Amino acid sequence: MSCRLLLYVSLCLVETALMNTKITQSPRYLILGRANKSLECEQHLGHNAMYWYKQSAEKPPELMFLYNLKQLIRNETVPSRFIPECPDSSKLLLHISAVDPEDSAVYFCASSHGQGVSGNTLYFGEGSRLIVV
């Protein structure tokens, strides 16, 4: 990941703390053993692109999935047990089957008017912290 992209994503995360982005995520905190779980995100900004990011401890956020106009763009390095679902343009789900300790991280949902980070502002939710024990 380039330093420029990392800086951009970091600034977006800081900006999120300062404004009401109208993006909600649930649950906020989740501690569980090896089970199946779903994370939910909903945006009320009229955006047509939605994203899931994973931020593991002491690592930069990693783009997992992008839906643009309900079309999926997948990061091929993401394990197949992560399954995104976009039931409509304002909601994005992340289903995780057979949760593994390496899945412990904060999962951020984001949205934007268009695909990609060039020229588009990403608006982030507060994150869902998943701890697998």
From Swiss-Prot:
Paired cysteines (S-S): C41-C109
J segment, as annotated region: 114-133
Gene Ontology annotations for the cellular component aspect, listed alphabetically: plasma membrane; T cell receptor complex
Protein origin, superkingdom: Eukaryota
InterPro entries found in the cross-reference section: Ig-like_dom, Ig-like_dom_sf, Ig-like_fold, Ig_sub, Ig_V-set, TCR_beta_variable
Record carries keyword Glycoprotein: yes
Annotated stretches, region: V segment: 22-113
SUPFAM superfamilies on file: Immunoglobulin (SSF48726)
Name of the protein in question: T-cell receptor beta chain V region 86T1
Taxonomy of the source species: Eukaryota, Metazoa, Chordata, Craniata, Vertebrata
